[in-house]
Amino acid sequence: MSRFTRKYRARDYNAILICNRRTIMLKRRDFIASTSAAFAALSLPTRAQNAKQLTLWGPPVTPSVLLAIAAQEGKAKDISPFDVQIWRSPDQLRAGLLNGDIAASIVPSYVAANLYNQGKKVKLFNIMSEGLNYIAAPVANGKPLVASLADLAQHSLVIPFKNDMPDLLLQILYKKAGLDFSAAQVSYTATPPEALVLFLSGKVDCANLPEPLMSLALLKAKEKGKEITRALDVQQLWGEAFNTAARVPLAGLLFTEEFIAQNSAFIAALDEDLKAAVAWSKANPEKTAELAAKYLPFPQEALAAGIPHSRFSAIPAASIEAEILTFYTEMHALNAKITGGKVPDAGLFYRA
């Protein structure tokens, strides 16, 4: 088994995680927005590694489970045996992509744009996460505290990670709606669990939470005798604002051009495997949650509840090119550094 292999078990979600009986504090870099995150290098158990195996990497959040499903159920492994590993931080991902240690990985979609604009020979293959973010709010008299962005602007809100994906998405949506985000009552935390604690304590009215943290919030609130809800679906808000499907092209599988040249048959089979994995996860949420719970520091119950709201996908990036470029354009307008100084051209997208 790889030196990266770890199994994580969560015992206390009030801002700490328990890992092999050792307490580790969440750190900002170890959690990816879209998305939200786990902390430490992990390896999903597919096959014993050997020098000839390929390695597919993923973030420490639920979409990486699709790689594990594909490894167990799919046909690509019969063409080239492969191992699935989890990068523990954006820094590890970037270093691996730059030094060649990582040639195939699920990445935040803006990372693909940034690398491409730096002149790196990479292609965005597909979109595997269409967004995981929700606005949690209390319920009073059968109604959620907020029902629109305009409502949200009148209440206090906690967001994990200042100037990271959840924050950036909301800033763009406020701007599109003609709302002044700088005037909003926003608090930031260094970790998602801290945002959850702040919200459940009643110190803020609402919280911007990714799955499966949103589902965990619902479970914890119920334990405390409180009623909360997914008051706003950030993906739905994005679709309405930009006249697209109710999704955000948050993360996808990236390949280096060298990997593509050497593994064309494998990639074609993997494409079908991942599409099948999406369907399998929807048909088998409990089994998917059981698999995810072995590697992500969340209770299986929260994972099972959150997976149906996690918007897994395996959409070819080139097939929604315009939608992704719109996403990049908005990110670039907010902060040009996010996309590497410019909006990438269509050469970023993989085409067979």
Describe these PLM feature segments.
Residues M1-L26:
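Secretory targeting signals
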Residues D30-A48:
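N-terminal export signals
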Residues Q49-D180, V186-S187, D205-E211, I228-L232:
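Short, glycine-/small- and polar/acidic-enriched structural segments
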Residues Q72, L98, N117, K175, ...:
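Sec-exported extracytoplasmic/periplasmic mature domains
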Residues D78-S80, P144, W238-A246, S313-E321:
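Short, solvent-exposed loop/beta-turn-alpha elements that line the ligand-binding surface or hinge
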Residues Y110, E194-L291:
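Pocket-lining segment of extracytoplasmic ligand-binding domains
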Residues I260-L334:
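Secondary-structure end/capping motifs
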Residues L325-A352:
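Conserved C-terminal helix/tail region of periplasmic/extracytoplasmic solute-binding proteins
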